[in-house]
């Protein structure tokens, strides 16, 4: 499970897709953590 500023996702891919992040890296910006 990953968490971000507006809530949580069951999958890391979902968070990255929602925030439009680069899936090749394990980060999604300051508002995203694993």
From Swiss-Prot:
Domain of life: Eukaryota
Subcellular localization(s) per the UniProt record: Secreted
Cysteines paired by S-S bonds: 2-16, 9-21, 15-28
Tissue specificity comment: Expressed by the venom gland.
Keywords: Disulfide bond, Ion channel impairing toxin, Knottin, Neurotoxin, Secreted, Toxin, Voltage-gated sodium channel impairing toxin
Protein family (similarity comment): Belongs to the neurotoxin 10 (Hwtx-1) family. 54 (ProTx-1) subfamily.
Task performed by this protein: Ion channel impairing toxin that inhibits voltage-gated sodium channels. The recombinantly expressed toxin shows a weak activity against Nav1.7/SCN9A (25% inhibition at 10 uM), and shifts the voltage dependence of channel activation to more depolarized potentials.
UniProt protein name: Beta/mu-theraphotoxin-Pe1a
Annotated source species: Phormingochilus everetti (Malaysian purple earth tiger tarantula)
């Amino acid at each position: 499970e990953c968490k971000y500023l507006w809530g949580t996702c069951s999958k890391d891919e979902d968070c990255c897709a929602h925030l439009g992040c680069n899936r090749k890296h394990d980060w999604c910006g300051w508002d995203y953590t694993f």
